[in-house]
Amino acid sequence: MVFTPEDRLGKQCLLLPLLLLAAWKVGSGQLHYSVPEEAKHGTFVGRIAQDLGLELAELVPRLFRMASKDREDLLEVNLQNGILFVNSRIDREELCGRSAECSIHLEVIVDRPLQVFHVDVEVRDINDNPPLFPVEEQRVLIYESRLPDSVFPLEGASDADVGSNSILTYKLSSSEYFGLDVKINSDDNKQIGLLLKKSLDREEAPAHNLFLTATDGGKPELTGTVQLLVTVLDVNDNAPNFEQSEYEVRIFENADNGTTVIKLNASDRDEGANGAISYSFNSLVAAMVIDHFSIDRNTGEIVIRGNLDFEQENFYKIRIDATDKGHPPMAGHCTVLVRILDKNDNVPEIALTSLSLPVREDAQFGTVIALISVNDLDSGANGQVNCSLTPHVPFKLVSTFKNYYSLVLDSALDRESVSAYELVVTARDGGSPSLWATASLSVEVADVNDNAPAFAQPEYTVFVKENNPPGCHIFTVSARDADAQENALVSYSLVERRVGERALSSYISVHAESGKVYALQPLDHEELELLQFQVSARDAGVPPLGSNVTLQVFVLDENDNAPALLAPRVGGTGGAVSELVPRSVGAGQVVAKVRAVDADSGYNAWLSYELQPPASSARFPFRVGLYTGEISTTRVLDEADSPRHRLLVLVKDHGEPALTATATVLVSLVESGQAPKASSRASVGAAGPEAALVDVNVYLIIAICAVSSLLVLTLLLYTALRCSAPSTEGACTADKPTLVCSSAVGSWSYSQQRRQRVCSGEGPPKMDLMAFSPSLSPCPIMMGKAENQDLNEDHDAKPRQPNPDWRYSASLRAGMHSSVHLEEAGILRAGPGGPDQQWPTVSSATPEPEAGEVSPPVGAGVNSNSWTFKYGPGNPKQSGPGELPDKFIIPGSPAIISIRQEPANSQIDKSDFITFGKKEETKKKKKKKKGNKTQEKKEKGNSTTDNSDQ
């Protein structure tokens, strides 16, 4: 055969389309795979590269890729081995619903040259859904007149699976009256009904309980059960009948309210009331059907009554009952299927899942706070959503999967600075115009116990008057914790310690919640002047944190101790002491002395003495020293004076109110010759008690000597230091009188104690005077810090300040420096810590205004017992260094102890009270001659009488 050029060209043009068609068929070949639903990640689907005829080595160079109109994340290809595998969970019911066929369509594309392959992956159904009835209990009403073989419709079960897995078989529990009627309708669904096998008798059995079981065709089989409650009614013979048993309607979701869905028509062969039909929803109808639809009872017209939403519900199954008005009424039934058509009307939806709320303030960076998922029910660009977060917050959004985000911690938190954050998540779709939605998330910062309770100051000073009532509130401590809730719940407790031999908790208690400090018992200034303790504040965190604060409680003195008499034979206020006084005693002579002590301090312990009643006549021969208690003569005694005098001495302190004690002194006037005998008898009477206290007095003497030696050494050292120190500015001048001010208050603030310099014109300034500034407060509790206050501040209370021109007498100055005074000042007020009074130093030498009296002691707080002096007609003899005084007082002892050795025949009187001068009386005795025996008997009789008066 010969081919011309024209024939060859025509044949080539015809061959080219054939080759292209063959290449397209080869390139567009289609593969089919199958995979069961719910397959695990990595499940093998098929060797797609091998099946497509592609070499493994050319997959990457040829840009092998896969696309799908469905979810692309369900399947994935391993480019290393060319295997198609399951990438994420596949739910057939979610992917295809009840469609008989379900497959995933993939497009495989490779370049160089471009080739497109179509792959269908069939998703096989597995039996993972059991049959479900719409309700757990169905009620069926059956008239007893119904004939056997009557069928009553039942609500069947539904199975979300397909194929044989969704083929249901029903089984009814055993009953002689009922059976199960199963029919297959046009869409191959089974319509079940309750078959009446035997006539019912309501009077015999008004109700029947049955169980209907649905079993699917899967392997293994799954079942569902519903309870049937059959009520037998007594009604007529014909029920209304619809034209068809099932109706189907389609309507858009944006249909207006009032739109007619369908108009039903039912007929009843009965006449009259039994043929009058009313329409209604079946009692088993879902609540959402009633919310969205309504039916006219007379016409059977169903209309829309609520907004329809395709995304919320796209299918409604409505069971309608047509009931006649017979007695009893009968009903016919039909089903209306309403399918909703979709419209694009949805905004993005945001779902927040809080995982770690609240967030601890010590959480690490990257801690996941919440999970956020977004969804848009629309499709295409309208369903693509992007999320953003409120700026300038310590959090950020991290995308994990498609439409899934994690809210994580991006920087450190501090609850004390910011306790909560209000976050706003914004989701915006890709539509035009764009629709967006926001969601708020409140992130609270959980507290961590990182702050200990703190007090406003590390130490508090509290002033409390003694004799407070038990349970008295004296102070309130308060601590602040910057944390919150339990971490800021502060409880208070007492830091236990010993106070002497007792526990601190026996004195003080602290309320655990309020921090109020209470005194559990009355405090006694004489027993405890300062109580220092700590209160602990501890929070309720884990672990708990705490801190302590120190409280210094000063117990202020009150006038709660009456003066106590120290006379040996005075048994209290009702006792009496007798004293013999010669008529020859001169004016101003001390004939007796009343001694008293007061356990209080300050003005409460400053004692004054006065006669009761006061002397009504200027010629009354006796008087008592206002502050010394010394009874002295006011004039020379004469024969006209009564031989016996009963003196009542009232001892009164300066407290408010003042407390008193009364001493009775019986003074008998005797002739000078009788005094030695009386004194001798008194000395013999006192010998017994003195002998009993010899051992005690020896130890007291040793103690007094030791204290005196220590005092002398201290004074010498102090003098040496003062002499070596340079002079300071503001030294006192010699021409200015010393002014010592005292304040008229009833109690003294010991926290305001300060040492004052007392100056005189005769020597260097004195630094041993303790002055106390008063703290005036109407309340029994005074609180505050010890701060400097002016000692010259005026006060209106009594007693008034002393006259600055007042001076001590020469005899008083001698008595102040005597050993008797030092002994009394040290012993009468000595406590566990030693003497608690400072000795006042006053340097002035002016004539005393009145013998036997002394003005108030200088410096508040000096016990009045320190102002005890011996008086005589002149200055008493001063003891030299290392010597002891003739007599000194031992508190509580029955007599004045004599230290100096006396001759055996000495007649010195050793009575309990200091009386007049004995030396003068002794001289008079030596000058007198012995009387006759009658005179001696007379004197003896007088002496006996005097002793009886005592």
Curated annotation (Swiss-Prot):
Membrane topology note: Single-pass type I membrane protein
Source organism superkingdom: Eukaryota
Database matches in InterPro entries: Cadherin-like_dom, Cadherin-like_sf, Cadherin_CBD, Cadherin_CS, Cadherin_N, Protocadherin/Cadherin-CA
Leader peptide range in chain numbering: 1-29
Sugar-bearing residue positions: N257, N265, N386, N548
Keyword RNA-binding: no
Cellular localisation: Cell membrane
Biased composition (Basic and acidic residues): 909-923
Residue spans, topological domain Extracellular: 30-697
Primary localisation category: membrane
Transmembrane parts of this sequence: 698-718
Segments forming domain Cadherin: 34-133, 157-242, 243-350, 351-455, 456-565, 581-678
Keywords of the record: Calcium, Cell adhesion, Cell membrane, Glycoprotein, Membrane, Repeat, Signal, Transmembrane, Transmembrane helix
PXXP repeats: 799-802, 832-835, 873-876, 891-894
Cellular component, GO annotation: plasma membrane
GO biological process: homophilic cell adhesion via plasma membrane adhesion molecules; nervous system development
Cytoplasmic side: 719-950
GO molecular function: calcium ion binding
Region of interest: 4 X 4 AA repeats of P-X-X-P: 799-894
Family annotation (PANTHER family): CADHERIN-87A, PROTOCADHERIN ALPHA-6-RELATED
Protein role: Potential calcium-dependent cell-adhesion protein. May be involved in the establishment and maintenance of specific neuronal connections in the brain.
Name of the protein this chain belongs to: Protocadherin alpha-6
Organism field: Pan troglodytes
